[in-house]
From Swiss-Prot:
<dbReference type="InterPro" id="IPR020568">
    <property type="entry name" value="Ribosomal_Su5_D2-typ_SF"/>
</dbReference>
<keyword id="KW-0143">Chaperone</keyword>
<dbReference type="InterPro" id="IPR019805">
    <property type="entry name" value="Heat_shock_protein_90_CS"/>
</dbReference>
<dbReference type="Pfam" id="PF00183">
    <property type="entry name" value="HSP90"/>
</dbReference>
<dbReference type="GO" id="GO:0140662">
    <property type="term" value="F:ATP-dependent protein folding chaperone"/>
</dbReference>
<dbReference type="GO" id="GO:0051082">
    <property type="term" value="F:unfolded protein binding"/>
</dbReference>
<feature type="region of interest" description="C">
    <location>
        <begin position="560"/>
        <end position="634"/>
    </location>
</feature>
<feature type="region of interest" description="B">
    <location>
        <begin position="343"/>
        <end position="559"/>
    </location>
</feature>
<dbReference type="GO" id="GO:0005524">
    <property type="term" value="F:ATP binding"/>
</dbReference>
<feature type="region of interest" description="A; substrate-binding">
    <location>
        <begin position="1"/>
        <end position="342"/>
    </location>
</feature>
<keyword id="KW-0346">Stress response</keyword>
<dbReference type="InterPro" id="IPR020575">
    <property type="entry name" value="Hsp90_N"/>
</dbReference>
<comment type="function">
    <text>Molecular chaperone. Has ATPase activity.</text>
</comment>
<dbReference type="InterPro" id="IPR001404">
    <property type="entry name" value="Hsp90_fam"/>
</dbReference>
<comment type="similarity">
    <text>Belongs to the heat shock protein 90 family.</text>
</comment>
<dbReference type="Pfam" id="PF13589">
    <property type="entry name" value="HATPase_c_3"/>
</dbReference>
<comment type="subunit">
    <text>Homodimer.</text>
</comment>
Length: 634
């Protein structure tokens, strides 16, 4: 029996206690996933040993043959997962098995929805896969020794998943980690060779090192060898090194789940081998849903980097631009050195060339998804659309390609769904239309009936409706598409070009001239709150509207700056009025200057509200409105 020393009983971190209760009582509907998670962790431990052994070959301790072994004991009701990877020290065991970084568990708990299937999918993504052992086990024992430490510095960690764990020092001659699961009553079916082989084949066939189980011997006991014979139950070859023609969709899907720590299937993938001046293989995936921290600055992003099939690092961010941070996968290069570091990856012709090619490959994959599977692309857009909208600012070379992948709401579709591509929009341009019109706002509901759209509805011209907070910033970089300029319909003096006939333009000029006196009176009433007064060519039904000055920030950008605590440049709107509206005609006829001032102010405030802005002095607006209502009801 192994002698234990320095035994301690320690409590789990609070969040881990909550997590264990969820695991044990409610979370997994698909219990067999525990084996996938533990085998995946064992494979990561082997990768880490390979990487550290590049600099310190003595860590291999004379045995470089890495493997994972899965065993079971029907009588004892146990399942054992054993690896000879990097292993853990006592401090590692307390740190990794007794606590989880706050960004992991706390956020995991916050994102639980109560839907077992959805919640189970979160496990690997949040790095809490080890605790899935408690779904089928009422006790878990972990024996481990970190490579490079003496045999006497092994560690035994044990817990029943009830809020605390024991840890002790033990002798462990072999490096690596052995996890023994003591199965609960009713979970004995997992202590079976065929069951375990089936699960491993299903979830772990792609793992790049052998997963071994004892050979099954049927017949007389005398025929069984004295020492157990082990055989690999998986292919044990890196999936990306195999020819595409030999790989089934299901294998790609399971590999994705391993590299992305995601239990759902990817929407698309692209597997390519590049030969010639540069040699590398890439396998890229588009996930089916966004991680919880997609927009966190320190979120996990980047590809797994291998050099000549040796794992080098997770989250190599240098091979894809930030706006494609959701792409998962691996890149295996023959042109980088085995001792490559993150610093070396920061720049250089090899990395730059690979980044350019992988970016194009990713965008091609999205184009194909949009063309061949529009429903799946709609799912992609709901999850990652706002990240892709960062592209035109970050990647000038691919701006037009990215623009073609963007989706917006528009006046063409009354559902408000972001389903309109720019190519679709260009294909529906009205005769004589040489500009692409858009309007930004907080929500589809807020801008779908905006007064700014009135003239476009009258003429049957489609307008894009941009409602994401990033959109106004996006349009400052995306100035044209397919050779046609974008025009914000709420900005400047609207010129419809050929969409207005010469007769229309002449009539507009005459009306504007005839209303110069009224414009001067309204300007005097509104004072410095407006930059300019003019007759509107935008309005057909509303009395007035506020337009944004040509060089001024729009409402979205002002709100973004305010929210981030930055100074907002001062700007004043342009007040446009509809000379044919009955309210404006009554205003023109009003001789009482106080009443004229009140009416002008109410129209100004209503125009601000219609534009989605807030009032500087809502109490004054209500007071004036009440005064006018009293006069009307007298």
């Amino acid at each position: 029996m192994t002698v234990e020393t320095d035994k301690q009983t320690l409590g789990f971190q609070t969040e881990v206690k909550q997590l264990l209760q969820l695991m044990i009582h409610s979370l997994y509907s698909n219990k067999e996933i525990f084996l996938r998670e533990l085998v995946s962790n064992a494979a990561d431990a082997a990768d880490k040993l390979r990487f550290e052994a590049l600099v310190k070959p003595e860590l291999l301790e004379g045995s470089g043959e890495l493997r994972i072994r899965v065993d079971y004991d029907k009588d004892a009701r146990t399942v054992t997962i054993d690896d000879n990877g990097i292993g853990m020290s006592r401090e590692d065991a307390v740190s990794h098995l007794g606590t989880i970084a706050k960004s992991g568990t706390a956020d995991f708990l916050k994102h639980l929805s109560g839907d077992q299937k959805k919640d189970a999918n979160l496990i690997g993504q949040f790095g809490v896969g080890f605790y899935s052992a408690f779904i089928v086990a009422d006790q878990v024992d972990v024996y481990s020794r970190r490579a490079g430490l003496p045999a006497s510095e092994g560690v035994h960690w044990s817990s029943r998943g009830e809020g605390e764990f024991e840890i002790a020092s033990v002798d462990k001659p072999e490096r690596g980690t052995r996890i023994v699961l003591h199965l609960k009553e009713g979970e004995e079916s997992f202590a079976d060779g065929w069951t375990l082989r089936g699960i491993l084949k299903k979830y772990s066939d792609h793992i790049g090192l052998p997963i071994e189980m004892r050979k099954e011997h049927y017949g007389e006991a005398a025929d069984k060898p004295a020492e157990p014979e082990w055989e690999a139950v998986n292919r044990a070859s890196a999936l990306w090194t195999r020819p595409k023609s030999e790989i089934k969709d299901e294998e790609y899907q399971e590999f994705y789940k391993h590299v992305a720590h995601d239990a759902g299937n990817p929407l698309a993938w692209s597997h390519n081998k590049v030969e010639g001046k540069l040699e590398y293989t890439s396998l890229l995936f588009v996930p089916g849903r966004a991680p919880f921290d997609l927009y966190h600055r320190d979120s996990a992003k980047g590809l797994k980097l291998y050099v000549q099939r040796v794992f080098i690092m997770d989250q190599a961010e240098q091979f894809l631009p930030l706006y494609l941070r959701f792409i998962k996968g691996v890149v295996d290069s023959s042109d980088l050195s085995l001792n490559v570091s993150r610093e070396i990856l920061q720049s250089g012709p090899v990395v730059d060339s690979m980044k350019s090619a992988l970016t194009k490959r990713s965008l091609d994959m999205l184009e194909k998804l949009a063309k061949d599977k529009p429903d799946d692309y709609a799912t992609f857009w709901r999850n990652f659309g706002q990240a892709l909208k960062e592209g035109p600012a970050e990647d000038y070379a691919n701006r037009e390609k990215i623009a073609g992948l963007l989706r917006f709401s528009s006046t063409h579709d009354t559902t408000g769904a972001q389903s309109v591509g720019l190519a679709d929009y260009v294909g529906r341009l009205a005769d004589g239309q040489d500009k692409l019109y858009y309007l930004t706002g907080e929500s589809y509901a807020q801008i779908k009936d905006s007064p700014h759209l009135e003239v476009f509805r009258k003429k049957g011209i489609e307008v894009l409706l941009l409602t994401d907070r990033i959109d106004e910033w996006l349009m400052s970089y995306l100035t044209e598409f397919d050779g046609k300029s974008f025009v914000d319909v709420a900005r400047g003096d609207l010129d419809l070009g050929k969409l207005d006939s010469e007769e229309d333009k002449k009539a507009q000029e005459e009306v504007a001239k005839s209303k110069e006196g009224l414009a001067s009176r309204i300007k005097a009433a509104l004072g410095d709150d407006v930059a300019e007064l003019r007759v509107s060519h935008r309005l057909t039904d509303s009395p007035a509207i506020l337009a944004i000055g040509q060089g001024d920030l729009g409402l979205q950008m002002r709100q973004l700056l305010e929210a981030s605590g930055q100074a907002v440049p001062e700007s004043k709107p342009v007040f446009e009025f509809n000379p044919t509206h009955p309210l404006i005609e009554k205003l023109d006829a009003e001789q009482d200057m106080d009443r004229f001032g009140d009416l002008s102010r109410v129209l100004f405030d209503q125009a601000a509200l219609a534009a989605g802005d807030s009032l500087k002095d809502p109490a004054a607006y209500v007071r004036r409105l009440n005064k006018l209502l009293l006069e009307l009801s007298a």
